Amino acid sequence: MTTFLFLFHSTVGVVRMRKALQAAGASFRVKDIPRQLRGVCGLCIYLSCEPGEEQKWILPGQTAALFRVAGDDYQLLAQFPPQA
């Protein structure tokens, strides 16, 4: 399992993803954004899953960025624009 961190453009994205993850029975945590990262809404979601599975949880227009987590290191995998 790999841990991924999702940042969102707003708290609406956090709430939508949390509900979807709960419904799927996924292992996740909602936390404050780490200090070394910047985010609009102040909250993020840590998701533990097999590499590749994180892609299905990207919410177009809601997800701002996706990171792979290794200890205190965050590797940026992708950034996404807000929905117009």
Go through each PLM region and give its residues.
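Amphipathic, hydrophobic secondary-structure cores in small proteins
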Residues: T2-L5, H9-E54
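C-terminal structural segments of small proteins and small subunits
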Residues: C49-A84
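Residue-level preference for short coil/turn positions at secondary-structure junctions
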Residues: M1-T2, Q62
